[in-house]
Every structure is written in C-alpha cells, then in structure tokens.
Amino acid sequence: MKQFDKVVLSAKDVIKNYGELEVLKGINLDIHQGEVVVIIGASGCGKSTFLRCLNGLEDIQGGDIILDNEIKFSDAKNDMTKIRQKIGMVFQSYELFPHLTILDNILLAPTKVQKRSKEEVKKQALKLLERVNLLDKQNSYPRQLSGGQKQRVAIVRALCMNPEIMLFDEVTAALDPEMVREVLDVMLELARDGMTMVIVTHEMQFARAVADRVIFMDNGNIAEQGEAEEFFSNPKTERAQKFLNTFTFKK
C-alpha cells in the first residue's frame, strides 16, 4: 500500500443543506498529495454535491474545507477565484465555448484569469493536446469533435491552469460506451504521474484500477472507506455489499 504524508485538502464536519433537505451530514475527509480518492455510491447519496463543495462551487452550512492545511474556505478574506485555480474540476458536460477553437478554449482561462503570456500557455496546451492524442484538433471547433474528444479537451483545459488537485465529476456518464475508455485512459495516466485526484464515478472496474482509496457514500454520510482492492474484494458494511452486488450479473 502506498504511503501518503502531506494532507492537501480537508473536509471538516461538512454540512450541506438545500432548504430543509440535509444532503451532507458532517463529512470528514483528508486528501493527501499524490493520492487518488474515488467516491462511489447510489444516485442521490451526495457524492457530486460533496465534490462541488470541495472547490467552493457550493456553499456549505456547517464545517469547513481547508486547502494546504491553512486556507479555510469559510474565511471571508480568502479569494475563492484564487482557491479554484488550485483545484481543477472536470464536469459531466464539457462546457466548451462553441464559437472558439479547441486551442482558444484552452487558452482562455490561463491568459484572462491567471494573466499568463499566450506564448507560454500555448506551448503547454499543445504539449497536453499531444499527450491526449488531439494535437491535430487544435484548430477545430467543439461541434467537430466526438463526446470523448471534447471531454479530453476539458481535461486539458483544467490541467492548463496548473492545479494542485483535480476533481472529476462523473466525466464519462454522458459518453457513448466506446468513448468512455479514451477518457479513462487519460485519467489513469494522470494518476500514474502522481496527480492528486478526487473522482466521482459509476465505473467500478475503473475505480478499482485507479483508486488508492475508495469512499462509499450513503445518504449524505461516508458509510465505508478503504484501500481499493480491500473494499471491492471484502466490503465491510451490508450497504456497501448491496451496492456492489448491483454491478454483478449471474446467469
């Protein structure tokens, strides 16, 4: 089992409500540098909401999120725009600007938000596009790309901001089955390179392959967590066992 020392992102007693509905009920979780944490659970368990809380896209009603052991999201003096630059996020819908080329979509945030030089960012963007086998699409428009290609562009766009941590929210859920693998392969490679990642997914085989740790959420709580192989081979709670059984088919 890999050893991880430095905590880079922490959730402390995080509570999230939508009106009377309590979605997250006091979540505690530490994410370590270089660790790949996969969050799984049934629809409506709170996993995607929790992920959005981890980079400040959702306000929380209790507890705190802490970056690098010192930057508290609850502290009003902290600029959430700067915090979000350290925590990249890729969504289920790629949200590329249709009127911009692929390259211009990638260059937009680093040049406008981070005020970096276009030449520097372009060099980085082209390297990343080559890495995900899309260098030849740099001058294409989103409508000319498949869903899998657009999702790989969305990953490159997030990486071009040089984040410390990457969050992935069910990024293959809207893709045709044959396009899923090309996106998951990019994420596997990022994991091998040591990127700190938190991934919400329904792809159980992928979760088992990529995760250092699996978090199983149920009804707004962490019901079970553990090393990936141990969790999938020998889940401790009845709820986790039932959940995993829904992915098993016997003739």
Feature names for model-found ranges:
Residues Q225, E229-K251:
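C-terminal boundary and immediately downstream tail of ABC-type ATPase nucleotide-binding domains
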